[in-house]
Amino acid sequence: MSQRIKTAAVDIVHITSGRIASGMLSHEPIWYRAMAANMPTTVYQHKPHFEKLARIAQRESEKLNEFIKTRSKPVRVRTRHLYEPVHLKFMEDEIREIFYKQHPWELARPKLIVENSGDDHVTQDWSKMYQANKKLDGESVVQRTIYLLGEKKTHDQKALLEAYDKARFEFYKLRMAEDVQNVTAAEEADMFGACFSTSSVERNLFHEQKRIEDWKEKAVEMTLDMGAK
């Protein structure tokens, strides 16, 4: 068991007195009474200068809180962004993003992106959804929404959503009418004896399946040959 370090001669007298009182010592040491009667008044042990250490610690703390300058030169603003084109934002893009996020399968439908003269929009009347010279798609919803907004403020989100919902429901009606018309036409043609050839997808699946069957036969033959050897 570790003992407390004696820092002064008076500690020896106190410790010895306690041991005598507790019975640890059966008799007083020879020097006990002389030491108790003439206690030392001067401590010759070197003590650390706590005030000096406190000042050093305070000075180190002040250094940590000082402002440290890491650059010898001022920071220069990079000018490369000044020559980049300005980001253009249109309300039509916002409507397209909403529509195709809600109707991802519309992106799978074939689209005509080439115009005959480049001014087909001149002959389009967006007071109604159906256009004789344009196929029904997501762009129809966008243009119809813009037409319904009219002169209203573009930042009016409530008016924008109302116009979009109206154009969207008109789109649904025309899309369902197209589907019914296509199904009816196919049934009528089948009833009158029309023969429909296989589509490109069906032909590709047929050739793919044939390749798989050929590979399966060759794999079985190779397996049997290796087993016989």
Swiss-Prot record:
GO terms for cellular component: mitochondrial small ribosomal subunit; mitochondrion. The keyword Ribonucleoprotein applies. Keywords: Mitochondrion, Ribonucleoprotein, Ribosomal protein. The keyword Cytoplasm does not apply. It holds the Pfam family MRP-S25. InterPro entries: Ribosomal_mS23_fun. GO terms for molecular function: structural constituent of ribosome. It is found in: Mitochondrion. Component of the mitochondrial small ribosomal subunit. Belongs to the mitochondrion-specific ribosomal protein mS23 family. This is Small ribosomal subunit protein mS23. It comes from Yarrowia lipolytica (strain CLIB 122 / E 150). The gene is RSM25.
